[in-house]
Amino acid sequence: MKITGISGSPRKGQNCEKIIGAALEVAKERGFETDTVFISNEEVAPCKACGACRDQDFCVIDDDMDEIYEKMRAADGIIVAAPVYMGNYPAQLKALFDRSVLLRRKNFALKNKVGAALSVGGSRNGGQEKTIQSIHDWMHIHGMIVVGDNSHFGGITWNPAEEDTVGMQTVSETAKKLCDVLELIQKNRDK
């Protein structure tokens, strides 16, 4: 089974890349195949709401979304990490989420995939829960199965994430829960 991690930060090598890496390491240790999307490396233009994707299986905007669509389609689970920018995730991740409407219009391509969210803020109560709830909203819109970390919403860290031992534990627990649910689904399919 495959888990795709999406680092929603426009900043390279920072906290989101570190927490998505930690989460995917848990998945690898459990035997999952992993893949990543680093929004900092991708060119994703905002949706124009042109409606062209209603009638075709591609977006008319020529950027990196075609590769991202394929990574999301190929995944059994998707874990998204986002920093808090003004109380929510950054515009670059919003563009990716908006453009994912193509996958919804094409028979709910993300339906029943398992999703989880991670967030990092500048302080312990820096908007991470709101950011995670917004990511969960996107997942629910796609009909995904959403999991948390067994305590609240998902993996919540503060800057610098790798020094936040409590936060990094929530990242690990969120990844474990994602893996647990995927394994349960697989066991049910194998019956």
UniProtKB/Swiss-Prot annotation:
InterPro entries: Flavoprotein-like_sf (IPR029039), FMN_Rdtase-like_dom (IPR005025), ISF_SsuE-like (IPR051796). Changing C179S: Unmodified 4Fe-4S-cluster properties in electron paramagnetic resonance. Homodimer. Changing C47S: Modified 4Fe-4S-cluster properties in electron paramagnetic resonance. Changing C53S: Modified 4Fe-4S-cluster properties in electron paramagnetic resonance. It comes from Methanosarcina thermophila. The keyword 4Fe-4S applies. Transmembrane segments: none annotated. The electrons derived from oxidation of the carbonyl group of acetate flow from ferredoxin to the 4Fe-4S cluster and then to the FMN cofactor. Its cofactor is FMN; [4Fe-4S] cluster. Belongs to the SsuE family. Isf subfamily. Signal peptide: none annotated. [4Fe-4S] cluster binds at C47, C50, C53, C59. Redox-active protein probably involved in electron transport during fermentation of acetate to methane. GO terms for molecular function: 4 iron, 4 sulfur cluster binding; metal ion binding; oxidoreductase activity. Binds 1 FMN per subunit. Binds 1 [4Fe-4S] cluster per subunit. It comes from the Archaea. It holds the Pfam family FMN_red. The gene is isf. This is Iron-sulfur flavoprotein. Keywords: 4Fe-4S, Flavoprotein, FMN, Iron, Iron-sulfur, Metal-binding.
